[in-house]
Amino acid sequence: MSLGIMEEEDLAEYFRLQYGERLLQLLQKFPSIEDQSDSPSVRLLEKKKEAKIMHHAMEQKKETFQRRMETLNLRWEELGIKEAQLKAHIQKFEQFIQENDQKRIRALKKANKERELKRQRMRELAKAKQEMAVLRLEHQRLSAKLQEYSIFNKYLEKVVENSEFEEIHEVIARYKTLVSMHHDLMQSAQEGQEKIERAKARLARYKEEKDDEILQHNNELARLQMRFDRARSDVIIWESRWAHIQNTAAKKTLLLGTIKMATLNLFQIVSKQLKEATFVSLEDTHKQLDMIQQFIQDLSDIWAEVKKKELQQIRV
């Protein structure tokens, strides 16, 4: 807050403390123009001397007031520095939140990419299962044929008799060939099963790792959200305090304007009563109040003197 606003606020408080009740009491004691009477010149000079003494005391009070104003201005400057530091801290925190949002977006993109890779591996696993099922069917078919060939020896003999085979060993060789084919098929099926098991193990490890990463990111996001909520609550509190300070300053400025206007009106009335030229600025409220106080004090003293003389005359 600026120095001008501080001076106006404390000046209003000063007017209220120094002149509020005393000015009202003096005005109540002040007699009407018709009831006034001329006083001796000597008495008037004495009253002016007393007024000068009072004016000197007022000047001392003004100096005390100015020292108080300087102290308050230093305090307000410190408050302004702290306010600037708070705004800078809030700006840095907002930048920190923005950077963490960008990190979260990158983490989500990475998680989406990992999920797509997981789906691709699942498709590969399903394809391997289908191939394995086909191999099993082929194995079953060949096993059934082998069983048929090994059981019926007579049938083999008849086959030798009625076919191009001349000996049973040729049929056996044919059988061994089929057995070898069966072995190869079984080995291929086993290798396919091992591939499936390895793929399942890799998939389980990958899923566990990604679940841990997602949990860590969620915990980090929750912690950052809590810090953000606390910072936002602090910002709301400081904004409310700042609005209260601005409203209070506006009210005091309005009160000060009213006091200055009333002082100026009263000063103009006093100037008319004095019927002499006064060289006081319209903005110099302090000097206007000093002249008003001096005028009222003079009139009060004159009135007291008149009352005293009237009482003496009545007693005589």
Swiss-Prot record:
Stretches assigned to coiled coil: 43-151, 182-236
Major location (coarse): cytoplasm
InterPro entries named in the record: CFAP_domain-containing, DUF4200
Alphabetical GO biological process terms: acrosome assembly; centrosome cycle; cilium assembly; spermatid development
Cellular localisation: Cytoplasm, Perinuclear region; Cytoplasm, Cytoskeleton; Cell projection, Cilium, Flagellum; Cytoplasm, Cytoskeleton, Microtubule organizing center, Centrosome
GO cellular component: centrosome; manchette; perinuclear region of cytoplasm; sperm head-tail coupling apparatus; sperm principal piece
Pfam families, per the entry: DUF4200
The organism's place on the tree of life at top rank: Eukaryota
Keywords assigned: Cell projection, Cilium, Coiled coil, Cytoplasm, Cytoskeleton, Differentiation, Flagellum, Spermatogenesis
Subunit structure: Interacts with ODF1 and ODF2. Interacts with CCDC38. Interacts with CCDC146. Interacts with CFAP53.
Family: Belongs to the CFAP73 family.
Primary role: Essential for male fertility. Required for sperm development.
The protein, known as: Coiled-coil domain-containing protein 42
Organism from which the protein derives: Bos taurus (Bovine)
Lineage: Eukaryota, Metazoa, Chordata, Craniata, Vertebrata
